[in-house]
Amino acid sequence: MKESPEFNVPVGQLQEADLAEADRIFRLAFGTFLGLPNPIEFAGNADYIRTRWTADPSAAFGAYLDKGLVGSNFATRWGSVAFFGPLTVRPTYWNQGIATQLIGPILDLFASWAVSHEGLFTFAHSPKHIALYQRFGFWPRFLTAIMSKPVNQASHTTDFSRYSEVPLGQREECLGACREMTDAIYDGLDLEREIRAVDAQKLGDTVLLWDAARLIALGVCHCGPGSEAGSDACYIKFGAAKSGSSFDTLLDACEALAAAKGLSRLIAGANAGREKAYQQMFTRGFRTEFQGVVMQRRNETGYNRSDTYIVDDWR
């Protein structure tokens, strides 16, 4: 099913005054597509809109018709890697070319960033979504499972530190260590944006695991309502480790963080192309809640390789 270009809508920077409406459209669009009895309840008290706009207002775009917001899209940059979403349009304006018009400015932004890898996460069961993104050179590769497990509230002995505890004068050095570790996994991969956003907005914390002075794993975690996790949950938005053993320790540390904050559920994304990490998560009790597919531009592998110990999902 193709979008017909019935409306040529102005697309520009999403304004702070429009964030409440962007959030409403986001919930209504996804809730309607998924067939929820009350679509506006989609995602509960999790926040995917204001948090991303606050992290980088220049990477948030809105489509406007008769001066009213009808859709929005967000770009995220992790150093040499960029992805977009959530891309949502008010349901009364579906199939009229608005989603297509919200993708163009994002791709222009990717080009200005000079990133080497671009992608998105979408519904694996929707031919309409797959076809839309294929028109822009994105191709479906491996499934990504959004997995969760109950948090063990028992005593955790994993030794880890938190970014929030790093003295201000040492944070640049800490971010440099994070950059060095992720760059070794994929050239130019850099999570500074996410680490800073979580800290500045008080969305959770970043777990850091060290071997002496060498960083061996990190996990950027959203915790509770108002973050991308929602009530009673800790969501590992991005986690990476140098080895299988340090990956296990990272998952322990993230669970310990969740327990310390009184949260009952640990959530993380597992890409099937990273089968070793996927299998370790399954062995540890993670189970799939739902799954989508990552679409990558030029059909490139990126860091979704069997030798990488990463959790993320690009939602």
Give the predicted meaning of each segment.
Residues 1-6, 15-32, 154-159, 168-182, ...:
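A short, well-structured alpha-helix characteristic of acyl/acetyltransferase catalytic modules
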Residues 2, 23-74, 186-206:
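Active-site rim helix/loop that mediates acceptor-substrate recognition in acyltransferases
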Residues 60-62, 67-76, 83-88, 208, ...:
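Conserved beta-strand in the GNAT
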Residues 84, 110-125, 260-271:
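Conserved GNAT acetyl-CoA-binding A-motif
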Residues 86-89, 95-112, 131-135, 244-257:
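Conserved acetyl-CoA-binding loop-helix of GNAT-fold acetyltransferases
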Residues 119-122, 139-152, 287-300:
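Conserved catalytic-core motifs of GNAT/GCN5-like acyltransferases
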Residues 129-134, 138, 279-283:
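Conserved active-site tyrosine of GNAT-family acetyltransferases
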Residues 135-235:
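Amide-forming acyltransferase catalytic core, primarily the GNAT-like/NAT-type
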